[in-house]
Design a protein with these regions (language model features):
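C-terminal subregions of glycosyltransferases and related glycan-biosynthesis enzymes
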Residues: 122-194
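Donor-binding/catalytic cores of nucleotide-activated saccharide
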Residues: 2-112, 119-132
Length: 194
């Protein structure tokens, strides 16, 4: 995000791990600071304790359990992996971290987690977390519809069950966040009915 920052050694630490461990992705830890009070919180702190995970089944399991970072920032991803799997952001689609991370987790075979803080997230009243409009609701609906396509196209029953659970959790979370941010019954109902 443009109002956040990476630590001076963020990229060098991630590159060193990626090259040493031969992984497709490295995720760093996040320090969250409330801008008005300078208070530090653990809003985006890594919850996973493993240093390296290999195998898509285990990676996807951890992702749908919520133990894998969802924000798109603070990740170093192998460019060839992104191109091979056509993992691109959709122009004009807002807040697609969940979509990008979900689609990455569907195919990711190796990841390392760096417990060092490599990203500083500044939480303030102008943060997207606190400011949502109808376009944001529309984008979340679009993202849920893309998840639904992955669900419909999935061949394996166990993974299909996991995708459905992820869709339900995603919808619950976005409805809750939208209510907290807007307290607009009409927009909330619009999102709920979609």
């Amino acid at each position: 995000d443009s109002d956040d920052e990476i630590t001076p050694d963020c990229i060098s630490k991630m590159v060193e791990i990626a090259e040493r461990e031969h992984v497709q992705m490295v995720c760093g830890n996040v320090k969250t600071i409330k801008l008005d009070t300078r208070e530090e919180t653990d809003a985006f702190k890594l919850v996973i304790t493993e240093k390296k995970i290999e195998g898509n089944k285990q990676i996807f399991d951890l992702f749908v359990q919520g133990k894998f970072p969802v924000p798109s920032w603070n990740k170093l991803i192998l460019l060839d992996f992104l191109k091979k799997n056509q993992l691109y952001f959709t122009p004009g689609l807002f807040a697609q971290d969940s979509l990008q991370s979900f689609e990455t987790a569907l195919v990711l075979e190796s990841v390392c987690f760096l417990q060092d803080y490599t990203y500083i997230y500044y939480l303030h009243q102008d943060s997207v977390i606190h400011n949502r409009k109808k376009k944001h609701f529309d984008n979340w609906i679009t993202i849920a519809q893309i998840f639904e396509k992955h669900y419909q196209n999935e061949k394996y029953p166990e993974r299909k069950k996991q995708i459905l659970a992820y869709i339900i959790d995603y919808k619950d979370l976005t409805l809750l966040m939208n209510w907290k941010a807007q307290k607009n019954e009409q927009l909330w109902k619009y999102s709920y009915d979609a």
